[in-house]
Amino acid sequence: TLLTLASSAEAQFFGQPSDLPIGEAYHVEILGGMWNPTPSLTISSEAFGIAGTDIDFTSDLGIAAKRFSEVRVRLRPGRKHRFRIDYVPIRYSAQSVVGRRLVFRGIAYDVGVSVNSTITWNTWRLGYEYDIVHRSHGYFGLIVEAKYTEVEASLDTQFGREFARARAPIPALGAVMRIYPVRVLGITAEITGFRLPEGVDQSYGGEYIDFDVYGTLNFTEKIGVQIGYRSLDMSGFFETESVDL
């Protein structure tokens, strides 16, 4: 569930307020809230010429679901133009006993070894949206954005700590559609993604897909609540690391 706060806008800029849905006349919109993703985290890391195991941080290391915060900012200089800024910090940690032999960063972790595992996944999204169709009861727009993703996984035992880190700027294209069945309720669906096929670059490859559908109930022009479903998937390889999140 997300709490939505939006600043007011001058009526002559967007048209008569009576023609617009509640909460649609704004210059700046700030959303802050929580979401509870189902963890699906697989990472492999090689070192010293030794291939790494595909480690499932859920089944192998006991990572469990938890809630995370999210911040979204929308800057709207014109009726059909939106600049988008999103930040999603994700961090999991767990303590477990290895149930099968794992190899990570060239180090073997045998059955029975106690491991403290941590994985962080931070994503920034900077984008621009242009609404090619904009009506009083909804709009349809195209999105171009750049995502900056940083993933770090670490295993800590009595013998030492090993970690793998992958950073990548990822361009993405997408689309968004919103409809207002009534003036106080907006229903939105958006998707962005990018795919770099294998063979284009021998060091990097993979895909990133972000799908979001949600409803926004606006109590006033400045306050509303939002609830919905989001799927955020990334898979790829970065030199000696591969990830599937």
Model regions: which residues?
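N-terminal signal peptide c-region/cleavage motif recognized by signal peptidases
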Residues: 6-8
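Short glycine/proline- and aromatic-enriched beta-strand/turn motifs that initiate or cap beta-hairpins
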Residues: 11-90
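Transmembrane beta-barrel architecture of outer-membrane proteins
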Residues: 25-27, 66-70, 121-125, 168-172, ...
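Residues on the lipid-exposed face of transmembrane beta-strands in outer-membrane beta-barrel proteins
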Residues: 30-32, 71-75, 85, 126-130, ...
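Transmembrane beta-barrel strands of outer-membrane/channel proteins
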Residues: 30-36, 85-89, 142-148, 189-193, ...
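Extracellular/periplasm-exposed beta-strand and loop segments of Gram-negative cell-envelope proteins
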Residues: 38-66, 89-122, 148-168, 196-204, ...
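Repeated loop/turn-to-beta-strand initiation elements of outer-membrane beta-barrel proteins
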Residues: 80-83, 136-138, 183-187, 219-225
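Detector for outer-membrane/organellar transmembrane beta-barrel domains
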Residues: 139-141, 148-151, 159-197
